[in-house]
Amino acid sequence: MGARASILRGEKLDAWEKIKLRPGGKKHYMLKHLVWANRELEKFALNPDLLDTSAGCKQIIKQLQPALQTGTEELKSLFNTVATLYCVHQKIEIKDTKEALDKIEEEQNESQQKTQQAGAADRGKDSQNYPIVQNMQGQMVHQPISARTLNAWVKVVEEKAFSPEVIPMFTALSEGATPQDLNTMLNTVGGHQAAMQMLKDTINEEAAEWDRLHPVHAGPVAPGQMRDPRGSDIAGTTSTLQEQIAWMTGNPPVPVGDIYKRWIILGLNKIVRMYSPVSILDIKQGPKEPFRDYVDRFFKTLRAEQATQDVKNWMTDTLLVQNANPDCKTILRALGPGASLEEMMTACQGVGGPAHKARVLAEAMSQVNNTTIMMQKSNFKGPKRAIKCFNCGKEGHLARNCRAPRKKGCWKCGKEGHQMKDCTERQANFLGRLWPSNKGRPGNFLQSRPEPTAPPESLRPEPTAPPPESFRFEEATPSPKQELKDREALTSLKSLFGNDHLLQ
């Protein structure tokens, strides 16, 4: 069908275009807003033809109003547009959108008051405080709990097996019930007899505590008065249905049904704790677990904790952040202690996914690279050596970048025919002496040792056999003169090692 702009014509269209979008604003409603509303209704699976009449607009308002608190801005804008259009159809004079919303609220309040008055008149005729109702004769009679309620209760116990949500379900189904009705609900539970025995023990303990705090008055009961209920009467074991109704509807009333229900809920809390053995301290977020799933497990376990609301609030503020994984914990601590649960879940959305892992890895690699660069820079700190050109002899550039005419020959000695790396010009060695030396030997060689020469043939002695003593392996002892001569041969090492203490 497409979007339509023919919803309003004539006077209604003029009135529509005079209404401002905001109080004190300059912009007014136009035909394009009706076209947009048509398209948005199709998105919400609503019939756009409902905009043609005031009754249709009222139906749209009833459909959209429950979702306003959790809806998007588009939903709120659509609701405001339909509310304004409803006022135009009803010919209600308004100046802006806020006045239209106020008119809608006034009509809804008036309709609600009429409904309450009609309901109160009907209740005054036939019933008071279900399941105890008043019959036509004005007597208070009991309506048994329905089979549908019992079936819902049994189904919850079988499916949930005393999980934390069983307690609110029991509270809702047992609203206004008598002790007899409550016993009927407990007796319909076929399985979990160990849990039911624990519940009976808790009820007996509470009944004994009631008897201790409310002792029996001495003497007979005055005529026309009801006796005070005992613990067993509240539990429905020693009292009749008529007595229970009389206590609950008396003046002053004794709410035996509510008291008994409170005892049962206390026992159910113990059973829920037994069926949920996991402590709130053990609920920790896994390394790859989404934060939303972790929050669900946390509050499900917190629901089973036997603690006051203040303690549970402290657990939520402290343990929820403390037991999160390192990635979420870093984000939550950055939000601060006053962050709401919605802000936490929004901030941690996507943590643990591929995109988040890639971002974390990139940040880690960036930090490693920065650290490496800083270490490399720190290793080469110190005064910089000035570079010198071998061609022109000036500092600040190298020979390959020199603009001066290239010097011919060796850059060291100035002679042609060889390069500087092959230059044989004398240069100082590590002892500070010029090398090559004209004397032949460097300073760290023996200088005064005579060169060995062969004697003339005329002076050569005839070879004779050595004496027998020379074959003995004896240690030769040098003479003092020979030792002094050897020491004098080492005098040239003074330049290297200083004074020789052996000569002193």
Curated annotation (Swiss-Prot):
The modification Asymmetric dimethylarginine is found at R406. A motif (PTAP/PSAP motif) lies at residues 452-455, 463-466. The keyword Hydrolase does not apply. It comes from the Viruses. The keyword Repeat applies. Residues 187-225 are annotated as: Interaction with host PPIA/CYPA and NUP153. Residues 14-33 are annotated as: Interaction with membrane phosphatidylinositol 4,5-bisphosphate and RNA. Disulfide bonds: none annotated. Residues 275-361 are annotated as: Dimerization/Multimerization of capsid protein p24. GO terms for biological process: viral budding via host ESCRT complex; viral translational frameshifting. Gene3D superfamilies: 1.10.1200.30, 6.10.250.390, Human Immunodeficiency Virus Type 1 Capsid Protein, Immunodeficiency lentiviruses, gag gene matrix protein p17, Single helix bin, Zinc finger, CCHC-type. Residues 215-223 are annotated as: PPIA/CYPA-binding loop. PROSITE patterns: ZF_CCHC (PS50158). Residues 105-128, 434-486 are annotated as: Disordered. Gag-Pol polyprotein: Specific enzymatic cleavages by the viral protease yield mature proteins. Capsid protein p24 is phosphorylated possibly by host MAPK1; this phosphorylation is necessary for Pin1-mediated virion uncoating. Keywords: AIDS, Capsid protein, Host cell membrane, Host cytoplasm, Host endosome, Host membrane, Host nucleus, Host-virus interaction, Lipoprotein, Membrane, Metal-binding, Methylation, Myristate, Phosphoprotein, Repeat, RNA-binding, Viral budding, Viral budding via the host ESCRT complexes, Viral nucleoprotein, Viral release from host cell, Virion, Zinc, Zinc-finger. PANTHER family: ENDOGENOUS RETROVIRUS GROUP K MEMBER 24 GAG POLYPROTEIN-RELATED, PTHR40389:SF4. Late-budding domains (L domains) are short sequence motifs essential for viral particle budding. They recruit proteins of the host ESCRT machinery (Endosomal Sorting Complex Required for Transport) or ESCRT-associated proteins. p6-gag contains two L domains: a PTAP/PSAP motif, which interacts with the UEV domain of TSG101 and a LYPX(n)L motif which interacts with PDCD6IP/AIP1. Belongs to the primate lentivirus group gag polyprotein family. HIV-1 lineages are divided in three main groups, M (for Major), O (for Outlier), and N (for New, or Non-M, Non-O). The vast majority of strains found worldwide belong to the group M. Group O seems to be endemic to and largely confined to Cameroon and neighboring countries in West Central Africa, where these viruses represent a small minority of HIV-1 strains. The group N is represented by a limited number of isolates from Cameroonian persons. The group M is further subdivided in 9 clades or subtypes (A to D, F to H, J and K). This is Gag polyprotein.
